[in-house]
């Protein structure tokens, strides 16, 4: 049996260094379990299901669906959760000019994205799927991001750094990318990858306290 006196764990179903950093800076050392889920296939299933109902999934539905797919994949891989443990899946995408954008993956695509988004306002949407004791809490957080009118030289240098390749929207708020964000309106932790207010709401929904998970 799990030790009832032990600090409960947060298990993070994500390989994102940013999500890990958010939790660590908030006093939590999570257990990281990378899901390996096929995100394209998971998204296509959602689109097909919505089409069968004569509708198109919303951006919030899409990111929450991918977040849950990641967490579910970890559960299906045989993750053993102790009493009090919580599993978190997350996914972020940028809504720009009516189009959802994920990670650029290459320098060339990063340059193309930034040439499109510089000087504009976009919405960074982060979906969360949080599992505890057989129950799910799902929710999304949307934050407005106002991009600077960055020069071609700076865009190319930022792309060459490799930093934004694995980031939704081809930018980071907390590192080099911070030079090119004029301001945000909303939750900064959500832009980085995980909304601490939303996670707190989920824990409270389950009858848990944030401080139960502090382990530093």
Cite the ranges covered by each PLM segment.
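Surface-exposed, flexible loop/turn segments at secondary-structure boundaries
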Residues: 18, 38-40, 136
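N-terminal beta1-alpha1 ligand-phosphate binding loop
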Residues: 5-28
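Anionic-ligand binding patches
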Residues: 2-9, 53-216
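Glycine-rich, phosphate-binding/catalytic loops in enzymes
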Residues: 28-31, 105-107
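Cofactor-binding loop segments of dinucleotide-utilizing enzymes, especially the Rossmann-like FAD-
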Residues: 15, 35, 133
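Charged, glycine/proline-rich intrinsically disordered loops and linkers
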Residues: 39-61
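A short beta-strand-loop structural module common to alpha/beta enzyme folds
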Residues: 30-41
């Amino acid at each position: 049996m799990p030790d009832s006196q032990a600090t409960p764990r947060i298990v993070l179903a994500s390989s994102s260094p940013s999500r890990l950093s958010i939790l660590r800076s908030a006093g939590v050392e999570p257990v990281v379990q990378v899901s390996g889920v096929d995100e394209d296939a998971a998204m296509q299933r959602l689109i097909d299901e919505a089409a069968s109902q004569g509708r198109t999934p919303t951006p919030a539905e899409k990111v929450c669906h991918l977040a849950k797919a990641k967490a579910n994949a970890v559960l299906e891989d045989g993750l053993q959760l102790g009493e009090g443990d919580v599993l978190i899946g997350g996914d972020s995408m940028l809504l720009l000019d009516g189009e959802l954008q994920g990670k650029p993956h290459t320098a060339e695509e990063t340059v193309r994205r930034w040439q499109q988004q510089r000087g504009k306002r976009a919405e960074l949407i982060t979906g969360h799927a949080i599992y505890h004791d057989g129950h799910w809490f799902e929710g999304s957080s949307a934050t407005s991001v106002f991009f600077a009118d960055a020069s071609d030289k700076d865009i190319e240098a930022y792309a060459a750094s490799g930093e934004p390749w694995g980031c939704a929207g081809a930018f980071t708020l907390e590192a080099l990318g911070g030079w090119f964000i004029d301001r945000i309106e909303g939750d900064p932790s959500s832009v980085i990858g995980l909304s601490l207010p939303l996670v707190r709401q989920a824990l409270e929904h389950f009858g848990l306290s944030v401080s139960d998970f502090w382990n530093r």
